[in-house]
């Protein structure tokens, strides 16, 4: 958190000087340079903010407590939280959740965050479909067609700061946070990409 704080101060100064320069009468090519500098400063600002959030999440995870909880309800709540986003993107998820109660040793807030990050990623890269399955052995599989991905990109989805498309306003921390949280809970998260379908599998700690 100290690093991200130390980066914020000079960034604020850069923005201040940029705003002053943009108010001056400048040749057109200088204006283009200033716009380019502002864009890169904005990207660095976002990276700093996400780094700050990442360090907060990871530090909180150090004191994480695990409980035996029902996965059905946690998954249903996570899907409900993304209902408006899915609807806005014209995605109607295919959901399969057993009637029987599936339990696992997890931290509810952490697992909710993991699922939220996966769903957010799915919305970004989905071709319009989404399949969510909770199996009886406690695995949660979230899959969708993602023709914009490659196998190499899929393998790097959990890398910190890696983003598939640099044009997207994201530094790629969402899934790396999900991986860190799953490891803290003694579970796993994996990605499999075959025939243009990306599947994220979350496996919680068994009882």
What are these regions (language model features)?
Residues 39-44:
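Short alpha-helical segment of the dimerization/phosphotransfer core of two-component systems
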Residues 149-161:
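Short conserved segment of the HATPase_c
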Residues 67, 92-102, 137:
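Conserved catalytic submotifs in the C-terminal HATPase_c
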Residues 59-64, 103-106:
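Conserved micro-motifs of the catalytic ATP-binding
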Residues 65-80:
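A conserved beta-strand-to-alpha-helix junction within the catalytic ATP-binding
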Residues 122-123:
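Short helix-loop "hinge" at the ATP-lid/N-box region of the Bergerat-fold HATPase_c
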């Amino acid at each position: 958190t100290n690093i991200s704080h130390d980066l914020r101060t000079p960034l604020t100064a850069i923005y201040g000087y940029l705003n002053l320069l943009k108010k001056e009468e400048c040749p057109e090519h200088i204006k283009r340079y200033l716009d380019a500098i502002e864009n890169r400063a904005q990207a660095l600002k976002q990276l700093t903010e996400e780094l700050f959030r990442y360090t907060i999440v990871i530090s909180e995870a150090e004191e994480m407590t695990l409980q035996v909880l029902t996965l059905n309800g946690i998954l249903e709540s996570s899907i409900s939280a993304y209902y408006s986003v899915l609807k806005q993107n014209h995605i109607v998820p295919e959901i399969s959740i057993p009637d029987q109660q599936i339990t696992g040793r997890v931290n509810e807030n952490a697992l909710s965050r993991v699922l939220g990050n996966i769903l957010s990623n799915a919305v970004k890269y989905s071709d319009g479909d989404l399949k969510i399955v909770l199996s009886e052995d406690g695995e949660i599989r979230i899959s969708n067609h993602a023709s914009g991905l490659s196998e190499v990109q899929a393998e790097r989805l959990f890398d910190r700061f890696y983003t598939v498309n640099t044009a997207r306003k994201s530094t790629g921390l969402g899934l790396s946070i999900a991986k860190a949280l799953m490891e803290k809970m003694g579970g796993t998260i994996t990605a499999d990409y075959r025939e243009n379908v990306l599947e994220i599998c979350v496996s919680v700690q068994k009882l």
